[in-house]
A protein has these predicted regions:
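Active-site loop/lid in soluble adenylation, ligation, and acyl-transfer enzymes
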Residues: 1-50, 134, 178-187, 191-195, ...
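Short beta-strand
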Residues: 30-34, 73, 114-116
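Membrane helical hairpin/interfacial module
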Residues: 35-38, 44, 71, 77, ...
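Short glycine- and Lys/Arg-enriched binding-loop motifs that mark or flank ligand-binding interfaces
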Residues: 38, 65-67, 74, 122, ...
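Short helix/loop capping segments that flank catalytic or ligand/cofactor-binding pockets
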Residues: 41-42, 49-51, 151-152, 156-158
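Short, hydrophobic/aliphatic alpha-helical segments
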Residues: 51-65, 127, 132
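A glycine-rich, hydrophobic loop/mini-helix early in the fold
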Residues: 58-82
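Catalytic beta-strand/loop module used to bind and position nucleotide/cofactor moieties
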Residues: 77, 81-191, 199
């Protein structure tokens, strides 16, 4: 498994990268990535029913559709995203515990009472800090999730507010939960970069075939 700590913060590039790795390679991957301020919507969502269009337009926040289902999520540099791409393991499809276990175990080792909820979310004391989604094809599974570490909650709540004048929609709508940042629950304060390093170490230590990998110009 190749472990990538992706440094590019372009949301369109990062989403295209994980889709490319999933659809056009035959390797296993774990990737950490962060995006500049953006909204990422599920493949089946009516975008207008999920975002505060006026706020998003005025603040020039890009809205990008991903290849997995689930709700709309707000990204900024205080939000850390993780992606697993696993080949030939269709039995792990919908097994969110399997893919989120490293995050939960790492946080618990740091004294944070993280747990998986029944709705594919990770919670701390009943508050959501991570949403997860998956897709699969004949070759394997892509699982990705968000980790609110030190995100701008003000922008998050404004960007995802629904306009009360909108028409009723039959499209899938997000189930909103109370949210929290991981950083608020750490006994010892660390940066998002330090947390990223800890999570990468956790992945490498837990997988015998895992090795760090940096994307080359040829890859890009």
């Amino acid at each position: 498994m190749l472990v990538i700590n992706q440094k590019t913060t372009s949301p369109s590039f990062n989403l295209a990268l994980e889709e490319y790795l999933f659809k056009n390679t035959n390797r296993d991957y774990f990737m950490l990535w962060r995006n500049e301020r953006s909204i990422i919507v599920g493949k089946n969502q009516n975008t207008y029913a999920e975002i505060n269009y006026k706020y998003v337009s005025e603040n020039k926040i890009p809205v990008i559709r991903r290849i997995t289902g689930g709700g709309a999520v707000f990204h900024d540099l205080g939000n850390l995203n993780f992606t697993f791409i696993k080949r030939g393991q269709r039995d792990t499809f919908n097994n969110y515990e399997y893919f989120t276990r490293p995050v939960v175990e790492l946080l618990q080792s740091l004294g944070v009472p993280a747990e998986l909820s029944g709705r594919n979310d990770l919670l701390i004391k009943g508050m959501k800090f991570s949403g997860n989604a998956q897709c699969a094809d004949d070759t394997g599974i892509l699982h990705h999730g968000t980790l609110l570490f030190d995100a701008d909650m003000g922008s998050l709540s404004q960007a995802l507010n629904v306009n009360p004048l909108k028409l009723k929609s039959k499209s899938i709508r997000s189930v909103r939960s109370r949210v929290t940042n991981i950083s608020e629950h750490l006994a010892k304060k660390i940066t998002i970069e330090e947390f990223s390093d800890l999570l990468i170490k956790k992945i490498i230590d837990s997988n015998a075939d895992a090795m760090p990998y940096e994307l080359t110009p040829d890859d890009i």
